[in-house]
Amino acid sequence: MPEKLCQNCFYIVSFPLNVSLLFEKISTMMYFEKGSATTDLTPEDLKTGLYEALEKLGNRQKVLAIPPDFTRYPSHAGELTEFAWQYYGDQLTDVLPALGTHTGMTDEQITTMFGQVPKSIFRVHDWRHDVVTLGYVPGEYVAEVTEGALSFDWPAQVNKLLVEGNFDLILSIGQVVPHEVVGMANYNKNIFVGTGGQEGINKSHFIGAVYGMERMMGRANTPVRKVFNYASEHFAAHLPIVYVQTVVALNKETGKLQTYGLFIGDDFEVFDKAAGLSMQVNFEMVEKPLKKVLVWLDPSEFKSTWLGNKSVYRTRMAIADGGELIVLAPALREFGEDKEIDRLIRKYGYFGTPHTLKATNENEELQQNLSAAAHLIHGSSEGRFAITYCPGKNPENLTKEEIESVGFRWGDIDEITEKYHVPTLKEGWNVMPDGEEIFYISNPALGLWAHKDRFN
């Protein structure tokens, strides 16, 4: 087992690998695909599709699964991971949730999401210490894809388990959905961010923020994605990764979550097809700018503004100038999932791009934590509309003073819930007894909303 990685070398030259793995994957392909804007896949359908793909892959001796964490619970990645474990048994030796910078999963969350998969095979990703660098995307390429906005080298970093574990199959499992950092979530983001390191995560987030979130959300082939794809092609092609991608959205007619697609393959095509379907079912072009948007954050999933600000990202292109976003966040207890990022958010706040870029230029601690700087940009309305957070009232919740200190308004969750009859609201447009129109969203992580004036 190698002790450390040559930081300036490609991994395939720096380590004594199982050579057969390097040449096993001669061609790329789709192993399974099923999905449309009317498809409704059951858990049994997902199991059948996964098993069909695994049969095509042939015998595998040591398998690693990389699903998302509990923040992606609706993705069905938990069930698919359990199905993979049922298929491979003891040959599925490790499960590494793609935490990125998120807090590790609790035993209760693991049981809820992954069923009977043994807790003993779960590993916890440490984005600050557990990574190796496969290679560097050159600054010239970064400058090319960002239209000159940035020109630093980008490190392709992954958890060391991927390269030291001698796996002959790595299943990267997750949901493709609009995303604020990369345009559309999943595919190789699950690898380079979900199991990535501090520098790689920081710089990828900053690329997206500086290039412009609204230029990227809902697009599959963004500058950040191009950087990831470069890394996949040049530095990670030897890793036996197969992507298992779901498309899940809220069915507006039934009011229930529906699985619209399952795509399994080992190259960009699997992601591209899933992303195309996602934009059909996860995206809504609103007929007019929204003056008031009310978003509910499920307390089992959203405990920080790091995650809860999806309510800002996913609705910003739909909200009218001078409008208001009200976020009901009963479990809100922190700003960042990571303690250092939490401290930086408290110190610098969500005060817009010019303020954040100035602070970044002047403060080394932000320069060393560019994902935090990017998040501060993403989480601001740039003064265009008001953002009101309504946390719960338990001792662990963020206080009114804490909410207001970072640039948000504070709202009383009980008063807002009563005023807008929240338990009775339906998805989308609602008209209150006094004639006020509001737009309600029960889970911002599942969609993207925009008005044509702000989405080209």
Predicted features along the sequence, with ranges:
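Conserved, well-structured core segments that form the ligand-binding/active-site neighborhood
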Residues: 124, 128-286, 317
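Long, charge-dense
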Residues: 94-142, 349-369
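Histidine-anchored nucleotide/phosphate-binding helix
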Residues: 73-89, 308-319
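Cysteine-centered motifs
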Residues: 6-9
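Extended hydrophobic packing segments that form well-structured cores
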Residues: 33-34, 38, 43-47, 382-456
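C-terminal catalytic subdomain
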Residues: 302-397
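Short glycine-rich or small-residue beta-strand-to-loop segments that form or flank ligand, phosphate
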Residues: 62-73, 96-100, 172, 293-296
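Glycine-rich phosphate/diphosphate-binding loops that line cofactor/substrate pockets in enzymes
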Residues: 49-64, 88-89, 165-166, 283-292, ...
